[in-house]
Amino acid sequence: MRPIIEFCLSNLASGTQKAMEELEKDPNLDIIEYGCLSHCGSCANDKFALVNGEYVSGETNEQLVENIYHYLDENPMF
């Protein structure tokens, strides 16, 4: 089973598209887009994704990608 990275369409439109595109290059990740992830307050202010259901954010796309990989390293699925 691969880690699941979920993005909100509104957050993608606000700037996380490049982070998602970078993560899509990794064949070991499942990337999913949703209309809403119910984090509206955070969505308006942060670049974020849900990683296996947990909120991960970053100030830039590069930091978001880095934080996602850091989270995955610190929280292995098995």
From Swiss-Prot:
Pfam families: DUF1450. Signal peptide: none annotated. InterPro entries: DUF1450 (IPR009910), UPF0349 (IPR022916). Coiled coil: none annotated. Belongs to the UPF0349 family. NCBIfam families: PRK13669.1 (NF010190). HAMAP family: UPF0349. This is UPF0349 protein BH3414. It comes from Halalkalibacterium halodurans (strain ATCC BAA-125 / DSM 18197 / FERM 7344 / JCM 9153 / C-125).
